[in-house]
Amino acid sequence: MEKYKELLTGLEEISKKHDIVIHTETQIENGQTTINTQALCISADEKTNTDLLISDIQELISRIKNFTIKVTILQYNNDKLDIFKYPFED
């Protein structure tokens, strides 16, 4: 549970730093709290530095070491929606 709190606190700090919205969904099963990684949603716009954002998330995850997260960044580029996938594991 402590690692989960550390993750949420870190994500909150990242969302403030980058002026974005991060939504997470949690599940508690048999007394164990897990994060539904499919519901880690990041709402950002074209002014968001996605490389720095991903770097900050990777740094957070590397400190915690209990999570595997795949992040998909949706970025608008010249009125066209590009999807950038950044899978990484710790």
Regions found by a protein language model. Give the residues of each.
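Detector for the mature cores of small, proteolytically processed
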Residues: 27-90
